[in-house]
Structure formats: C-alpha cells, structure tokens
Amino acid sequence: CLAIAHVSLQVGDRELAALVLCLAGATAGFLVWNYPYGMIFAGDGGAYLWGVVTSVASILLVQRHPEVSAWFPFLILIYPVWETLFSIYRKMARGVSPGTADALHFHQLIYRRIVRGVFHEDHTHQMRIRNSRTSPYLWVFALLSIVPAVLFWRDTPVLVGFCLLFMVSYVGAYIAIVRFKVPKWLRL
C-alpha cells in the first residue's frame, strides 16, 4: 500500500494516495493489535479485502497515469501471484488437483524448516507466537520486490527483469528449503 501511495503522490494523484494510505493505516492498526499474539483472525475475507483494494488501486494508478508502468503493480504483487502459480504448477506436476490443500507453501516450509529449528519449543510454547515468527522472513522476501518497484516504477524493462529475478529467487529459495540447504544467515 505504501508503495502505491508513494507512486500516486509522485504522479500527483492525491485521492488515490489517500485511499491506499487508509488501507495502510487499517493494516498497521491490525498489525499493532495482532502481532505477534494473533488476537484477531482476518482470514480469507480480510485477505480478499486487502487484495481487492490493492488491485483496484493498482489498476486505477496505471489507467490514470500512463507514465506508470503496468509492471509496477505486478512487481509489488508478485509474491502472492507467483506463490499461487507455483503452487498450481507444483501440484499439477505431481498429478494432484490444484485445488487440493497441502502443507508445501513457502511460508509453511519456512516455519517447518527454519523457524522451528531456530526457536525451539521450550522458548516459544504458544503456537500463535511460533507461527508469527515466520512473518519477518516473508516481510524481507516481499521487500525484495517492493523496493525495486518503488525505485523503477516508470522503467518497464527493469521491472520485468526484477520480476524474473524474483521468480528465480523464489524457486531457488524454495528448492533450498525443501532440500534442507538453508544458508546459516537465514537461521539467525
């Protein structure tokens, strides 16, 4: 949201910036109240609301301001988009329906292969706190696409390059975690 607000202000669209800043404020309030103890469950409804508002704001930004590359919002949203596409591919490659639930999503692997190894059961005895320790890893990973998107919001070839780099990095990190070859610096 902040990335879209920043670019909206860069192109002079104060109304759109205000809309996404409201969503960012609501998200920050939810985060302050909810992290790390999980006091409120946003669930699918919350995720859909955030996704729809972010997507509509992205479409409006690109539609109203042709100087903003259409790849800007794509790079901002590449993590959930690529996670979904990769999960569909992964399941189809195994001959499983893409609609079948599994525990092989990136965040679940980070939890099972990294977080549980770093924060032992005796240090975090509450399930909600253990689960919340996955979030900082995902925030850093998401920033790998958000920062370049904000820096190069007009430059389509650079944004496409960062999209490809993100996809390759995601697959590389996924394979490394699955094979238990997680770099030591990620375990800190």
Where are these regions (language model features)?
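Alpha-helical transmembrane segments
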Residues: 1-188
